Amino acid sequence: MEQKKDFKNWHQKKIKLHEDKQRPFFHEREVWFASLGVNIGFEQDGRGDKFLRPIIVIRKFNNEVLWILPLTKNIKRGKYYMQISISDNRELSTVILSQIRLLDSKRLQYKIGDTSVDGLKEIKKRLAALIEA
């Protein structure tokens, strides 16, 4: 049975995010909790009252706009997934390569770590292969 999604509360949170004047300082390779909200169908949702989900910054265009990939603690295999390690965390996380997304940096809530330079290179390589397929 599908869990009911809380679009109403997410809409209120999204209004507050939009009105926020401050943006965090961030870099590529960083892993953050971001307010991804409530989404449609199989798109990855955030959780909790701030609708948070861990993400990795794969491309910084400027201080306002970035490409991200969502992460999950569930170990998944296949061409749409890749395991990475995050600094200060012994557990592996799974990058969901098929869910690349453009975000406004206002959605970034707090940094939780980094992945290695080689880790980001491998993510970009696998993502490019997925796009070219």
State the predicted function of each range.
Residues 1-11, 49, 84-133:
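C-terminal terminal-subdomain/extension
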Residues 15-22:
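Short alpha-helix capping/helix-loop boundary micro-motifs
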Residues 28-29:
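Loop/turn positions that initiate beta-strands
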Residues 44-88:
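Compact nucleic-acid interaction/catalytic patches
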